[in-house]
């Protein structure tokens, strides 16, 4: 049986995975807005990918989820700061058996999403991908494995996650079931707080960060603090997680930067509250010091709504 899929947020992540699904013949509707929506309607969606090559597919796209009948799967890919508002408008897409798979930055978006659509509909997800909107209607994938990690939020395995894994795999998206998806979510969170936070803070790509002992020490310190907060809140992140994070950073192209870096340079809103700001808040709650993350948060907070006006 072919899944009916809606992609809420057709940016880098949603656009890439939705495009792969559409190329495989899945029934996909993209929820988008502005020039990106207009370009997709007029010319289709173009994917330029190191993994999947370059292709263009005609797509169904709308800015109104109310025009889309209930679906089997919602890929929920909006920016973290839009989570609650976007969750409210996808209600028409939710049927009795609908799964909602969030592929977002941050570690508290699952709870905010579940509070609106119902926890019974939400499974945990992690997107192992680096991709951006290169131009309206065009998604550029530049790094990452193109893989999705998924699992029940409460842990363990289930028939529905196994079926979702199979459906994604059949469409050409590698998917792996994680028995404790919260650990996987935190592992990515720890990495991007460092990688994204420090490339944004310095306005420099990762190669320049790693070439400086002082800057790479800052990168490591941010990740170590986030890992300490994870453990203090009961998340069993691996002991070698920060070392693996540093090794992963070194495997990126030297010109690469994180999502905060790209959004900052484009004058867009920043997910700073969902990233380093969350480390600071949770650290305060569990009496875990986070001075490195506070410095990143404090320096970038004036840009949270875009370029500040003097």
Where are these regions (language model features)?
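N-terminal glycine-rich dinucleotide-binding loop that anchors FAD/FMN and/or NAD(P) in oxidoreductases
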Residues: 45-61, 192
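Rossmann-like NAD(P)(H) cofactor-binding subdomain of soluble oxidoreductases
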Residues: 54-138
């Amino acid at each position: 049986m072919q899944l009916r899929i809606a992609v809420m947020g057709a940016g880098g992540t949603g656009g890439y995975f939705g495009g792969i699904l559409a190329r495989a013949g899945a029934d996909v509707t993209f929820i988008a807005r502005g020039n990106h929506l207009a370009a997709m309607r007029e010319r289709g969606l173009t994917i330029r990918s190191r993994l999947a090559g370059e292709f263009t597919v005609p797509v169904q796209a709308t800015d109104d989820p109310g025009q889309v009948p209930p679906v089997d799967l919602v890929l929920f890919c909006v920016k973290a700061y839009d989570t609650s508002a976007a969750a409210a408008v996808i209600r028409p897409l939710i049927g009795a058996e609908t799964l909602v798979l969030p592929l977002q930055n941050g570690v508290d978006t699952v709870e905010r999403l579940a509070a609106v659509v119902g926890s019974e509909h939400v499974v945990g997800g992690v997107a192992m991908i680096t991709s951006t909107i290169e131009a309206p209607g065009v998604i550029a994938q530049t790094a990452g494995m193109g893989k999705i990690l998924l699992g029940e939020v409460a842990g363990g395995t289930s028939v529905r996650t196994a079926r979702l894994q199979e459906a994604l795999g059949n469409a050409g998206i590698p998917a792996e079931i994680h028995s404790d998806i919260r650990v996987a979510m935190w592992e990515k969170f720890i990495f991007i707080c460092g990688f994204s936070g420090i490339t944004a803070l310095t306005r420099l790509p990762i190669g320049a960060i790693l070439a400086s002992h002082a800057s790479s020490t800052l990168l490591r310190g941010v990740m170590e603090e986030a890992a300490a907060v994870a453990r203090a809140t009961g998340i069993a992140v691996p002991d070698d997680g920060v070392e693996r994070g540093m090794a992963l950073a070194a495997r990126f192209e030297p010109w690469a930067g994180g999502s905060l870096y790209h959004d900052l340079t484009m004058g867009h809103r920043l997910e700073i509250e969902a990233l380093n700001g969350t480390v600071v808040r949770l650290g305060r709650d569990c009496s875990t010091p986070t001075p490195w993350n506070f410095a990143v948060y404090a320096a970038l907070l004036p840009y949270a709504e875009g370029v500040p006006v003097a």
